Amino acid sequence: MVPEMGYLDEQFNQLEELQDESSPNFVEEVVALFLKDSPRLLSNIEQTIGKYPQDFYRLDSLVHQLKGSGSSIGAVRMKNECSVFKAHCNDRNLEGCRRSLQKMKREHATLKQKLESYFQLLRQVGPREHAVNSRK
């Protein structure tokens, strides 16, 4: 459901393939870790822009962490915007970094909402029906 909307890539599908009866909530748990950690990273990026606006090395490092975290669940739009931010760091373009941060925050909020809706729907459908439908 969510992958077709362009928010997630094949990595999300691969995570779903790892989920089985022994770990029926695997994907939701991995996504929950991302949703728990990513707001902290976004906040750290925002604070660094405010306190150390010319420390592009630190900004790049923080965004690299966010990009890796997003990539682990297949958050393609987050990953792409992180790449844009990193390019702004490379160009030492603070305004570009600020604009990109706002886009990352919007993408994160949208992704969070879509993932929460997706997992809520899966809980309503139930694990057996999901397993049967996901193998088609």
PLM features: what roles do these ranges have?
Residues 1-136:
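Two-component system phosphorelay core
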